[in-house]
């Protein structure tokens, strides 16, 4: 495991990577050309300031246009996510609905999408997400596709990242990937985003259900390939953070059998929820465990309803069963204080038994932990030394396991990075690693 320096955030939000350092050595001394050399310092400063203001005006204008587009799109947002009448296509990855977005990042086009996938029982389901592609010509064999797995945002349909006012802000490294010429697709995962005509969740909740999340990611790539301007090829980079790290790892494991036409060129994860047994065991008696459990146990009880004993009354206390529906309806980022206010009294009173040892929960946690199958691609794993949710020791154990079964792993530890910042702070190292394993597509 390599320890690297922390990434230095630039002027942009953490959804965008730092700027590349200038190449070609130290700057050359300025040349003196004719009358330019006689300009006074004041005139030079005025020229520079005027130029800077002009650039700023362009950037501000572009941002105002983007925000205006976001505002317009919110008006008809709910209608887009209503599941259409009729049967869901049985072919996984079928694009069912798309809508070009107005408020897009500079130098790109984007679409909101609904597409078909498959749940754990093999039934066709609808999933939502977004696709972003840089301006410019794609290679003859199509663009590399970066499939992003988002960290926990909640489980209610309203918590889907693509439904947010700015659906791009949470995609860590999006600007970096667009500049590399990649198409970027970000799934919401099954159970989020899409609703019935009555406004309730369409499809089973799938929080931390690894195989279902994997299918959501892989099928998002297939859907992106059906939008002609995206010009998406078959080469795929999987990149995920926390819950999304688990999704990316499972997608890499399942791709050979579920989506054999796709080539997984590289897999990158930041503080992945790779070992659910250790994750849950580390937080049984704190607010993180209660919050994660309020999302995970209802999802498992719904998805594994046919498994004997996999009902909430077998694992949660009566007090927890009373409060979990309310917690389960709240989104993590927008309702964190409320979630903690509800969950705090449940600390130490949340579960009847230790789910890491009590069946069938112990088996379900193991089955949804990554590492059960190999990955036929190089693997990048980033971990923050100050992460108090996914513990550094647990990630180190996962890395050791992957290396023991012959997987090529590049593991880095970022000093001082927390669980919330590790995906962003690892971007400089991730870019260097991608340079070695996945070529750029030219960029905008």
Predicted feature locations:
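Catalytic-loop region of hydrolases
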Residues: 41-138, 403
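Short beta-strand/loop motif that positions the catalytic acidic residue
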Residues: 375, 380-387
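Accessory cap/linker subdomain of secreted extracellular hydrolases
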Residues: 270-372
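Alpha/beta-hydrolase active-site loop
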Residues: 206-228
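Primarily recognizes the serine-hydrolase "nucleophile elbow" in alpha/beta-hydrolase
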Residues: 222-290
């Amino acid at each position: 495991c390599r320890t690297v320096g922390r990434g230095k955030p630039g002027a942009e939000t953490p959804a965008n990577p730092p700027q590349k350092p200038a190449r070609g050595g130290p700057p050359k001394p300025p040349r003196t050309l004719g009358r330019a050399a006689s300009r006074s310092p004041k005139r030079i400063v005025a020229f520079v300031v005027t130029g800077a203001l002009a650039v700023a005006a362009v950037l501000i204008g572009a941002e105002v246009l983007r925000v205006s587009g976001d505002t317009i799109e919110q008006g008809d947002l709910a209608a887009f996510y209503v599941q259409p009448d009729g049967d869901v296509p049985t072919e996984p990855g079928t694009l069912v609905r798309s809508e070009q977005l107005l408020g897009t990042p500079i130098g790109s086009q984007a679409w909101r999408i609904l597409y078909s996938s498959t749940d754990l029982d093999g039934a066709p389901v609808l999933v939502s997400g977004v696709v972003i592609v840089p301006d410019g010509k794609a290679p003859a064999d199509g663009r590399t596709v970066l499939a992003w797995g988002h960290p926990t945002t909640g489980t209610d349909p309203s918590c889907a990242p693509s439904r947010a006012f700015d659906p791009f802000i949470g995609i860590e490294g999006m600007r970096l990937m667009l500049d590399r010429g990649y198409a970027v697709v970000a799934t919401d995962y099954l159970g989020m985003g899409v609703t019935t005509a009555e406004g309730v969740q369409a499809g089973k909740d799938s929080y931390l259900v690894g195989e279902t999340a994997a299918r959501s990611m892989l099928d998002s790539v297939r859907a992106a390939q059906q939008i002609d301007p995206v010009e998406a090829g078959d080469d795929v980079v999987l990149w995920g953070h926390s819950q999304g790290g688990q999704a990316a790892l499972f997608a890499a494991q399942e791709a050979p059998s579920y989506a054999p036409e796709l080539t997984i060129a590289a897999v990158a994860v930041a503080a992945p929820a790779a070992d659910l047994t250790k994750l849950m065991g580390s937080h049984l008696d704190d607010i993180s465990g209660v919050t994660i459990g309020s999302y995970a146990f209802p999802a498992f009880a719904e998805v594994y309803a046919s498994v004997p004993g996999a009902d909430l009354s077998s694992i949660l206390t009566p007090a927890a069963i009373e409060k979990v529906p309310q917690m389960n309806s709240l989104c993590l980022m927008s309702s964190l204080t409320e979630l903690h206010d509800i969950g705090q009294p449940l600390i130490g009173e949340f579960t009847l038994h230790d789910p890491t040892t009590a069946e069938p929960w112990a088996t379900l946690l193991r089955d949804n932990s990554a590492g059960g199958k190999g990955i036929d691609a190089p693997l990048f794993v980033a971990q923050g030394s100050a992460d108090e949710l996914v513990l550094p020791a647990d990630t180190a154990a996962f890395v050791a396991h992957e290396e023991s079964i012959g997987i090529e792993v590049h593991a880095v530890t970022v000093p001082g990075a927390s669980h919330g910042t590790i995906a962003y702070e690892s971007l400089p190292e991730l870019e260097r690693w991608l340079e070695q394993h996945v070529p750029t597509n030219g960029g905008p």
